[in-house]
Every structure is written in structure tokens, then in C-alpha cells.
Amino acid sequence: MPPVEVDGWSRRIRVKTNAVGWAMSMVNASVEVDMTRHLSFSFPLYYSAVNYFRRDLKFRTFAVQPEFRWHFTRPEGLFVGAHFGTAYFNFATEGAWRYQTGYGNRPLFGGGLAAGYRKPLFRHHPAWEVEFSLGAGVYDVRYDRFYNEKNGPKEGTCHTTFIGIDNAGVTFSYSFRTGRRRGR
């Protein structure tokens, strides 16, 4: 039995990846599940263990940013979302310092709001989609600062509140209809 469609809508699961993350050498994947016609839940993961060609230039991270989304029409079109985010990081920018998650084990955490637009990538293959999104949030950040040299000693521990853009996406996805199929 095929999935039930109501007014042209059926529940879908999307498998996604963000091109902006890949441009930053961050492996990423996401799953989004339609909960109702207008509400969905997205769960992205980001990971990077990269030194950018040099020991003193790196952006290592592990982050998750689950988000509930409200779609104004169908899951295609305009949406807004509320998200929670947490991440571990270790980065250096060729300067005097290297920054690492506080105490090596306390992630940053916070949340924010996002908006975006999703549309089919191909007219004849609507399961392939592209979405454009931008989000901003507030995060509590505790980090350790080290001298940016081999085995550089710790200089101190800092605390700040980050307020700003916390995600940008050009995301490609493939969607699967959900539903039970019974054998004959």
C-alpha cells in the first residue's frame, strides 16, 4: 500500500548535506523528518579534523544543531526555525594564539532562529531539493587560549557570549516518502 497523500502532502524523510560546510572542509550530514504538514525536525552533524596545510592554521570541530522548522506552505517554500547548538572546537588562525573548547571538555552551547527557502532542484525529479538558509543565535563560550606553537603552553581560560550568525546553508537533499507497504 503506497504512502497516504492528503491534499498533495505526504510525510517525508530527507537526507541532506550542506555545501557551505564542505567548502570549510567540514564533513556534514543531516536528516530531516516531516512531523506534520507544516512542522519538521532537522538534525545536522558537522565534523572537521583538518589542519589547513600547516600546523598553526586549523579548524577542528564537532557540532550538532537540531532545529524545529515551521513551513508556511508545504515543506517546499519559505520556513522559519528555532535551533539549539553545541560544539567542541580547536582552531588557530596563523596568529599568536590557538583556541580550544574550555577545559578540553566543555562545549559551547546556545541557540537561535533561522529562516530559509526550499525548492525542488529538478522539475522532473522533485525528490532532489536545494535549500538556502541563514540563522543567528546566542552562545555561551568558554575556551582555553594556548600559544600557537608546537605543544604551546596554556595562557589562560576565557569566557564570552557570542551573538551573531551561527549557520549558513546551501543544502542539497534527497527525500523519501514514508509509509507502510504491505506485501501480497
Feature-to-residue mapping (PLM):
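Outer-membrane beta-barrel pore domains and translocons
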Residues: 20-22, 46-48, 83-87, 133-139, ...
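Outer-membrane beta-barrel "beta-signal"
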Residues: 1, 71, 162-184
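C-terminal beta-signal and adjacent terminal beta-strands/loops
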Residues: 138-148
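Gram-negative (and chloroplast) outer-membrane scaffold detector with strong preference
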Residues: 33-132
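Transmembrane beta-strand segments that form the barrel wall of outer-membrane beta-barrel proteins
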Residues: 9-24, 40-53
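Extracytoplasmic loops and strand-loop junctions of Gram-negative outer membrane beta-barrel proteins
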Residues: 11-14, 49-50, 95-100, 151-157
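Residues that define the transmembrane beta-barrel architecture of outer-membrane proteins
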Residues: 11-13, 23-27, 58-64, 105-111, ...
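N-terminal targeting leaders of membrane proteins
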Residues: 1-16, 184
